[in-house]
Amino acid sequence: MTEADEVLVRVRERADRAFARADLTPGMTFDQVVHAVERALKIRLRVVREADTSGWGTLTGFLTFFADRREGSIHVRAADAAIYSQFAASHELGHLLDDAHCSGALHERSSVSPHDNPLLTTPEYEAELVAEHIAHRIARLLYTSPRVAESSW
């Protein structure tokens, strides 16, 4: 097994645990997914659609979390289509659900490997991959039903 294979196994295992932690089920709406994460983690969350994102560059969303207050907010671009901003928010939900949380540095991107950015460590890269896997699973849960497919026609 290669190192990349080992990373992928760890990422999938963490994503499975994270997804199970929230007890997400098919047919949920995005708001229900957010509430399920709140219940699972015993926190309060807000998803904020930010109007002024001129300084964000390629950033599609970010998470702020205050452990002492058990509350956080996920910020996404208001200009993005709902399906896109929900995916960005789902990525941030993935960070919350992951048992090895990311460091939250803004320069960390799931599309950048530790080989391309020496400041990004393998554990940080894995945390980004876990969040992406969770976001994709949430998207499948939300958008693969006939109800959603028909509403996009």
Task: Outline where the language-model segments fall.
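Metalloprotease/metallohydrolase-associated module, dominated by Zn2+-dependent proteases
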Residues: T2-R39, S103-W153
